[in-house]
Structure formats: structure tokens, C-alpha cells
Amino acid sequence: MTPEEFYQALAKHHINLSAKQKEQFDLYFKLLVEWNDKINLTAITEEKEVYLKHFYDSIAPLLSGYIPNESLKLLDIGAGAGFPSLPMKIIYPQLDVTIIDSLNKRIKFLNLLADALELDKVHFYHGRAEVFGQDKNFRAHFDLVTARAVARLQVLSELTIPFLKVGGQLLALKASAADEELKTAQNALNLLFSQTTSSDNYQLPNGDGRNLTIITKKKETPNKYPRKAGMPNKKPL
């Protein structure tokens, strides 16, 4: 997917990028490739692949109408080089984006990237989701949480749902259908007072399969969740 094909694909969804937004995506690509040599951010570095498998893939929830261009508080867990939240932020500047990542070198890259792209209302924190999820400044604080290929839903739900306000939603972007994951995650969702709103399979323009699963928080999360760092993965709910 060339940059021009990327713009055209967005235009079909009535998203027409300004010259500044196009420049932001171009600079994002260039900085990603430049810094990838230093800190190994991604295995995908060819321009057409980055525009398809990072940029376009990240904005699927926008194209599907699941995220409006409003000043919602969005948390991205394990965003790596900023996916999916920063491509969303470029397109919908009103979003207030927070990223938590466990590797400090990625946080340094994100700070540099945000400055270069002139993004405001973006906040980056180094640490574990299990720790921040028990911090009153983060817990039950967000309208949306996104996670792209981070963990199985059984584990991911405990890492993310405590951050949501009641009525808030987890948007889990997956590389394949989530039917089996949802079955396995059902006990965790019950314990976390959340339920599946939708799970939709779709394709990228090149035919690659993807899945977007949305989980809605129904009641306050019990205080004991998330458990200590490492426990959600070692002993899933």
C-alpha cells in the first residue's frame, strides 16, 4: 500500500487527510525506520508494508466507526512504536492518548516522535500495566483502551479492564478470529464484570485477515485486579 493508496483508502471512508496529516505519516515512517536500526522497534520497515500493516491496520476501529473524533481519553497498552494509538491520534487530533510500555527505550522513541509530529495531548509512561492498573491516577480513568496483538484475551482483559470507566470499552485488535479466545476468556470477563459487545472479522486491502473484539465494562473492577506483575500471564483468570 503506497502512501497515495493509503490516502485513497481513507477517503473512501470519508476521511480526507490534510497536507499536515500526510506529512505526519511520512515523518512517522521515516523516524520509525531510522530508530529501528538503534532499538529494534519492528520487523516491518518497507514503506508499502508500514502503511498497510502498521498505519492502515491501526486505524481499523476508526474506519469501522467505533471511535469518534472527540476528546475521549484513550489508553494504549504495549503500543511498542505507537500502534495503534498514534495513527489514530494523527487522524483524530482531539483524542487524548496515553501509552504505557514496559521498555523505556520505546518510551524515549515515542517522546521524540510526538515532538517531531507536533502531537499534543499525548502522554507516555514506562512500566507494567499491572502496576499502573492499581494506581488511582490511572484506574477507572479511561473511556477506551486499545491493545494490538499484545496477549490472549484471557490475560489481556485483566491487564486492561481495570483502567476503564464503567461503560468504557476495550478494543482488542487481533491477527485472526477470536472465537476460541473469547470462550477461554469468559471466566475472566465475568470476574471483571465485563462482557463482549462485538467480535468482527475483516480483511486488510491485501486480503490478510484481522479481528476487532470489543469488550464493555459493566461494573467497577474488584480491587484485587489486576494482580501483581506477571501473575495474569502465569495464572490466567
From Swiss-Prot:
Keywords: Cytoplasm, Methyltransferase, rRNA processing, S-adenosyl-L-methionine, Transferase. InterPro entries: rRNA_ssu_MeTfrase_G, SAM-dependent_MTases_sf. Its EC number is 2.1.1.-. Residues 218-237 are annotated as: Disordered. S-adenosyl-L-methionine binds at G78, F83, A129, E130, R148. GO terms for cellular component: cytosol. It is found in: Cytoplasm. One of its GO terms (molecular function) is rRNA (guanine-N7-)-methyltransferase activity. The keyword Coiled coil does not apply. Specifically methylates the N7 position of a guanine in 16S rRNA. Belongs to the methyltransferase superfamily. RNA methyltransferase RsmG family. This is Ribosomal RNA small subunit methyltransferase G. It comes from Streptococcus mutans serotype c (strain ATCC 700610 / UA159). The lineage of its organism: Bacteria, Bacillati, Bacillota, Bacilli, Lactobacillales. The gene is rsmG.
